[in-house]
Regions:
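Receiver (REC) domain switch-region micro-motif
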Residues: 93-96
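Hydrophobic anchor at the start of a short beta-strand
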Residues: 60, 80, 139, 263
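A glycine-rich, often tryptophan-bearing local segment used as a flexible ligand/cofactor-contacting loop or short
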Residues: 100-211, 266, 276-279
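Short, solvent-exposed loop/turn elements at domain surfaces
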Residues: 68-72, 104, 272-276
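Stable alpha-helical elements in mature extracytoplasmic
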Residues: 65, 69, 124-128, 280-284
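Loop/turn elements at helix/coil->beta-strand transitions in domains of secreted/extracellular proteins
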Residues: 89-91, 135-138, 261-262
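A short, well-structured beta->alpha microelement
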Residues: 62-66, 70-90
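Extracellular ligand-binding/catalytic regions of CAZymes and related secreted enzymes
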Residues: 1-13, 21-31, 38-58, 158-160, ...
Length: 292
């Protein structure tokens, strides 16, 4: 496609690529040409995804009504119920809401706020889900309750703060890089069917890439984090010249056993990107298929 540019600002027309492009990665290449001489060239990649809904998926349970996730279920014809004592052991339960919200502050600390609209019976609910899994059920944690590593000790040193709700007792840890990179790398697994594997979670994964990782437990890690503390122990008195703190590894997506069942623990931003980013939808569908 050739477009003639005039002096000043030229409004470019939209390029209609149609609706029948095959699934895959594409490159749009743009060149600025004057008198048959290329002055400048750039390019941008984009992906086309397709989701197969020809096979009926099994039903799921959630712990709270949420328009974003229920709209997703409706679009993909997935039956759902609110988790209760009568939920079948064959029905995976999705933990789509927890009793706190976690934010990253500019200084590398973690801010946690208790949701005012959450039930006071949250611990009882988590205990019921733990018992459900122990008997052979499966739980998909898209939100992780439990302790968070914060800089709240003497001289802002790190301490694990909060309540352990899960039997594995994972600890949430800030894992967002600034000038220093923090890698989140996925591995080959059915959950990443039809998606790139063994790569850093940038590019097509940039919307769902985590900023919180899990430590202090053992599981089958599908997305792994390699990071380090910018300040040794978080101690504000050690932030000069000494260098960085410990190097650590955490999990962003992991499957752990509990009794006769399994728990999937995820810090990926899947719920936030449903009905917006197809990668989040493909991953959640793959997760549901994995546990059916």
């Amino acid at each position: 496609m050739e477009i003639k540019l005039n002096n000043g600002i030229t409004e470019l027309e939209k390029i209609d690529l149609g609706t029948n492009l095959p699934t895959g990665e594409y490159e749009v290449k743009i060149s600025l040409i004057t008198d048959n001489s290329i002055n400048y060239t750039t390019s941008i990649n984009f992906n086309i995804f397709s989701i197969d809904n020809s096979t009926k998926r099994g039903s799921v349970a959630i712990i709270k009504e949420d328009k974003k996730i229920t709209s997703f279920f409706g679009k993909h014809e997935i039956d759902y119920e609110i988790f209760s004592e009568s939920t079948s052991i064959e029905t995976p339960v999705i933990i789509n809401s927890i009793n706190t919200e976690v934010f990253n502050s500019k200084d590398g600390n973690v801010i946690e706020k208790i949701k005012s609209n959450q039930s006071d019976n949250f611990k009882d609910l988590m205990d019921n889900i733990n018992d459900f899994v122990n008997k052979g059920g499966n739980a998909i944690y898209l939100q992780i309750p439990g302790k968070t590593r914060k800089r709240i000790g003497p001289n802002l040193t790190f301490l694990a703060d909060g309540i352990d709700y899960l039997p594995q007792k994972p600890i949430k840890n800030f894992s967002q890089g600034l000038w220093d990179g923090i890698l989140h790398i996925n591995s080959k697994h059915k959950i990443f069917k039809n998606l790139p594997i063994n790569v850093n979670m940038s590019g097509i994964y940039e919307n769902i890439a985590p900023t919180i990782s899990l430590r202090n437990f053992k599981g089958n890690n599908i997305v792994q984090t390699i990071a380090f503390d910018r300040i040794p122990d978080g101690n504000i008195m050690k932030r000069n010249y000494i260098g960085s703190g410990e190097v650590w590894s955490g999990a962003d997506l992991s499957i752990v056993d509990h009794g006769k069942g399994k728990m999937l623990l995820s810090t990926l931003k899947l719920i936030e990107n449903l009905n917006y980013d197809p990668v989040s939808e493909i991953l959640l569908l793959n997760i549901i298929d994995y546990f059916k």
